Structures are given as C-alpha cells and as structure tokens.
C-alpha cells in the first residue's frame, strides 16, 4: 500500500518525537542535549503536519455526510487544523510560560493575516480584476473582524493606560491580569465565535441542489466516512497533535531560555509561528492546487478570525484556570502588562480593521487591495522584528 505524503510525515515525526519523549521520561540522555531541541522541532512539525491533514480529512468526511458547502466545510477543517496549536499553547501554559503563550497566539494572527493577503493575490479574477468573496465572508466574517478589532483596541488601550497612569493618590493599579480577568475575556471571545459558527452554518452551510451559485454548491471529492474510520482518524490526529504540540513547546522553552538560543520573546514566538503554521499554509496551497478555492480561502481567512477568537480565547481561559491552580500564583499576577503583551494586542486592531475595510467596500478583492495589505503587514513585521529585540 502506497502511503500518502501526510502519512509519511506523521510516521517520521512520530518516530522522532516518541523516542525523545520516552528517553526524557526515563531520565536517559543518550542524545547530546544541544541536538535534542532541533530534533523536537523537526519531529514536531512533521507530526503536526500529518495530524492537521488527518483532522481535515475527518472534517471533510463529516461535511460530506452533512451536505455542507465547500466554504463552510473549509471553515470546520480550518478549526480542526488549529487543534495542534492548542496543544502547543497548553504545554507552554503548563510550563508557566503565560506571556509566551499570549504572544504566540497574537503573533499567529499577524502572520496568518500576511498569508491571507499574499493568497488573495493569486485568487482567480474576473475581467475587471476582482474576485468575488463568498457571502459568508462579506456578511458574517466582516462582522467578526469588526468585533475583533474593537476588542483588541479597547483591551489593549486599557492595558496601556493601566501601565502608564497612576490612580488617585499616585498608587499604581496592579500591572498584571489575574485569573478572573483572563477567564472572563476568554469566555467572551469563545461565545462570540460560537454565535458566528451557528449563523454561518445555519444560513450559509447547506448545499442548495441544482444552484447556479458556486458558493452554495459543493465540489469537494470526498467519500462518506463511517463512524469507526472517523474514530480512528480522530485518534491518530489527536495523538499526533498532543505529541507534536509537546515537542514544539519544548523547543519554545529552548528558543527563549538563557540556556538555549536566548532569543527575545517576540522573536522566539515569531519563529515558532512560522514553523508551527507551516502545515496550515501547506493546506491552503494544496487546496488551491486542487482547484478547491473556497476551501483554501476559508482556511486562509479562518486563520485570522479563528486564531483570535478560539486560540487566543483558549489561551486566556487556560492561563486563568491553570494560573489559579498554580500554588505560587494562586490566580494573581498571571500575565504582566508590559510592552510585549500590549503591542501585539494593539497590532491586532489594524490587522483586522484593514481586512474588514477591504472586504466590506464591494465584497470583492483585487490586486491593489492585496498589495496594500501586504505592505502594511510588512511594515508591522519590521517593527516587531527590530523593536521586539530591544
């Protein structure tokens, strides 16, 4: 039997990560310590790449059984492909790296926005040089971008004001976010995204038979997936996501730690975003190559809104709960309010706002808008890379 590329990637990644984890558990050190983090990085990426594809195939099978449109099926596939990143963040939070998890989640939004802008350049255009965006993005996705940009701006400015200005009597407000605040903010984001999923599935999710609108049709070639096969795929995907996430979180400790690469925290987060996001970028490119434009577009767009509302929301909830259970913190002073934690949250505002503006003006996107977005994101990336190391 010939293995698919994702299966080969999964097997190789598992063959690298599992022995490393076993040796660490047993306290054995046969491999030089300076080589182990790089093996964890390579194995984690390959394992997560295979896990992402297994999750996507599972969701595509379910979508076929439920007669979902290509775009909405792609949204659920994109959500599934973020599960490995949730494991990465979970292991970072378990290790007490609350700020690293916060920065990693926000840096992912920024990098995925750049990917969406670049991908919008290669979308097939009509005779006027425009690509008509699905109604789900125009009518519902734009609302989500509006809410996300307002939330990021208001919370970011509030954190900055708390950090800069004293209260009456010159006493400073505690310059940390506590467990209760993180849990509250996180639940608010998750609730908004659940409402988004409900609306987009109910009104844009079902295939309309014999329709002339390609956005309400389905061209995905996937077979119905029996429950036992679905269970196997989900188990394989979850196992790979957990092991790969643990491996990448270990590399994150190495990249930002004084005994490792000792990179500034923003540089380490951006490095991890590039490596950890590679599987999702491959999914976008692969779907486009197979002419599954709606699936590729939903993955690219979902990499922005889903990361902010799901991954960032999960990060805050998990940090709040585990910080409360931490005997050293007891729910207090979990996340420091400082430059790095604030700047990326504020940067999420122009990132999502410019996307929202480009989408809502005429429900179309052209090369001028794509180049404009890319230019803005490159300037922001330069600021992060240059000033993030100060």
What are these regions (language model features)?
Residues 1-390:
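Hydrophobic alpha-helical segments, chiefly the membrane-spanning helices
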């Amino acid at each position: 039997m010939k293995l698919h590329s994702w299966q080969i990637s999964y097997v190789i990644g598992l063959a690298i990560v599992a022995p490393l984890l076993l040796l660490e558990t047993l306290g054995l050190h046969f491999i030089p310590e300076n080589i182990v983090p790089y093996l964890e990085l390579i194995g984690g990426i390959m394992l997560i790449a295979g896990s992402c594809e297994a999750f996507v195939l599972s969701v595509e099978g379910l979508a076929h059984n439920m007669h979902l449109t290509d775009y909405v099926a792609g949204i659920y596939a994109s959500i599934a492909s973020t599960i490995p990143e949730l494991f990465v963040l979970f292991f970072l939070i378990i290790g007490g790296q609350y700020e690293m998890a916060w920065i990693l989640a926000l840096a992912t939004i920024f990098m995925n926005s750049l990917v969406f802008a670049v991908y919008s350049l290669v979308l097939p255009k009509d005779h006027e040089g425009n690509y008509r965006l699905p109604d789900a993005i125009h009518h519902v996705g734009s609302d989500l971008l509006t809410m996300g940009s307002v939330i990021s701006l208001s919370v970011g400015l509030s954190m900055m004001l708390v950090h800069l200005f004293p209260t009456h009597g010159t006493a400073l407000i505690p310059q940390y976010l506590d467990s209760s605040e993180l849990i509250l903010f996180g639940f608010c984001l998750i609730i908004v995204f659940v409402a988004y999923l409900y609306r987009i599935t109910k009104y844009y999710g079902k295939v309309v038979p014999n329709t002339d609108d390609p956005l309400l049709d389905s061209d995905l070639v996937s077979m119905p997936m029996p429950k036992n096969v679905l269970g196997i795929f989900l188990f394989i995907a979850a196992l790979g996501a957990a092991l790969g996430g643990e491996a990448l979180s270990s590399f994150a400790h190495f990249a930002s730690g004084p005994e490792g690469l000792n990179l500034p925290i923003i540089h380490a987060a951006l490095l991890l975003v590039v490596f950890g996001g590679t599987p999702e970028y491959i999914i976008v490119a692969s779907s486009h190559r197979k002419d599954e434009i709606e699936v590729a577009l939903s993955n690219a767009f979902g990499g922005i809104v889903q990361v902010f509302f799901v991954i960032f929301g999960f990060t805050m909830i998990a940090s709040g709960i585990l910080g409360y259970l931490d005997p050293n913190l007891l729910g207090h002073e979990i996340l420091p309010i400082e430059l790095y934690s604030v700047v990326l949250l504020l940067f999420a505002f122009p990132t999502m706002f410019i996307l929202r503006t480009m989408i809502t003006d005429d429900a179309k996107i052209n090369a001028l808008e794509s180049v404009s977005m890319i230019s803005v994101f490159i300037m922001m990336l330069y600021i992060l890379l240059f000033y993030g190391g100060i």
